[in-house]
């Protein structure tokens, strides 16, 4: 049975709480690093022309979906008994390597190839007889598309002046993404998307210097630039109701150098 948007309100609230927690975590780590190490770390990662590392990451991702004009115009009758099509945020994780080229003390070029494990969830809500908020009469079908993605981000990293054993940074760039699953296999899913994309990525984080390594947490926002929708093989009940699908994600990275 369909609920009255309680599920989606929970996701919205959860996102705000998660972001606030991450920001507090960043500040707490920075304070801990400075309090524990009175002397400035001499690890020297920032002085090397080329440096390397690895990272672990957790993300929440979804589709950005745009309805077609036919669905927005009730006179066409194409919508049938479908009330709404709602992408839902879902969690995943990724891991990869860091390759960093030093351009200046405050500017780096980063290549960070990674493998990501994604799940894209979409709810299709159908209309029913008039019900109540507690016992709605409509129904919901959930479509899940799992994907393993290879991502090749190329980013600029601008760093603030170092203060003791920490410094803030910003990242900006793009990423080429391709799905490891064949398109023929993806065509059997209810809501079908293509497997290649280019994303625009923006992030913010802190470098924290320890005695033998550098730890850098970062929050990064990613927005897909291509329309991934493939209506030819999508479920015919709603394939004409969608005009555009793009990926977006929010990722927490934990970098180690």
Spans of features found by a protein language model:
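Residues on the lipid-exposed face of transmembrane beta-strands in outer-membrane beta-barrel proteins
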Residues: 54-58, 93-101, 113-115, 152-158, ...
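Structural signature of outer-membrane beta-barrel domains
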Residues: 59-63, 116-120, 175-181, 222-226
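Flexible, solvent-exposed loop segments that connect beta-strands
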Residues: 66-86, 119-145, 181-193, 229-243
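Residues that define the transmembrane beta-barrel architecture of outer-membrane proteins
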Residues: 48-52, 89-93, 146-150, 166, ...
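Outer-membrane beta-barrel channels and translocator barrels
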Residues: 47, 104-106, 161-165, 209-213, ...
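Cleavable N-terminal export/targeting peptides
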Residues: 1-46
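Short glycine/proline- and aromatic-enriched beta-strand/turn motifs that initiate or cap beta-hairpins
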Residues: 32-91, 257
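Predominantly the C-terminal beta-signal and adjacent terminal strand-loop region
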Residues: 195-197, 205-257
């Amino acid at each position: 049975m369909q609920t009255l948007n309680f599920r989606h309100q929970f996701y919205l609230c959860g996102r705000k709480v998660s972001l606030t927690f991450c920001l507090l975590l960043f500040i707490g780590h920075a304070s801990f690093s400075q309090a524990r190490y009175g002397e400035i770390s001499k690890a020297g990662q920032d002085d090397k022309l080329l440096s390397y590392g690895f990272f672990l990451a957790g993300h929440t991702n979804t589709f950005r979906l745009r309805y077609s004009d036919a669905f927005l115009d009730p006179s066409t009758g194409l919508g049938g008994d479908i009330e709404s099509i709602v992408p839902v945020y879902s969690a995943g994780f990724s891991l990869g390597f860091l390759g960093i080229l030093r351009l200046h003390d405050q500017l780096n070029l980063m290549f960070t190839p990674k493998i990501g494990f994604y799940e894209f969830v979409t709810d299709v809500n159908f209309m029913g007889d008039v019900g109540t908020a507690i016992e709605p009469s409509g129904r919901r079908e959930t479509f899940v598309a799992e994907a393993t993605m290879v991502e090749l981000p190329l980013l600029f990293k601008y760093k603030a002046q170092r203060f003791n054993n920490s410094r803030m940074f910003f990242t900006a760039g793009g990423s080429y993404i391709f799905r490891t699953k064949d398109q023929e296999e993806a065509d059997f899913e209810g809501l079908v998307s293509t497997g290649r994309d280019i994303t625009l990525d923006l992030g913010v984080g802190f470098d924290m210097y320890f005695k033998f390594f550098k730890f850098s947490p970062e929050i990064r926002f990613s927005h897909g630039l291509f329309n991934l929708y493939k209506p030819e093989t999508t479920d015919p009940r709603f394939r004409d109701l969608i005009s555009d699908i793009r990926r977006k994600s929010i990722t927490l990275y934990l970098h180690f150098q």
